[in-house]
């Protein structure tokens, strides 16, 4: 489901509605009345009757009920509809503190990346290692991170 639609379900207006824009000529082939009908339908879905009951029947999706239960336990208000749940989830996400990891605490991942030649595409240029005794210019020293730290930053992900 698209974030634009989820935001509409949670708050009753599109994400751009925060700045006074409204749904006008259609987006991605969706007309305004279809958009509003979809929002109204998704807003009215009950968590207890519709969501958790339907997912309880399908054994592959048992953890959906656990996820809903987790957010209901975290909330101070009663979450009864999909709109309540999405509004709470988006509020939690927007208020989550940024994760700050001191540079000295990051370790390089011990993953060996396969060569691009194995995929039949152009090979990536090899990273040339500079000799240890060769000093970088002042301009480069300010912004360059050692390769292990760059790899660690690209492999970090946050799940909320």
From Swiss-Prot:
Its main location: mitochondrion. The keyword Mitochondrion applies. It is found in: Mitochondrion. It comes from the Eukaryota. Keywords: Mitochondrion. GO terms for cellular component: mitochondrion. A stretch of 270 kb of the mitochondrial genome is duplicated within the centromere of chromosome 2 resulting in the duplication of the gene. The expression of this duplicated gene (At2g07714) is demonstrated. PANTHER family: PHD FINGER PROTEIN MALE MEIOCYTE DEATH 1 (PTHR46201:SF9), PHD FINGER PROTEIN MALE MEIOCYTE DEATH 1-RELATED (PTHR46201). This is Uncharacterized mitochondrial protein AtMg00550.
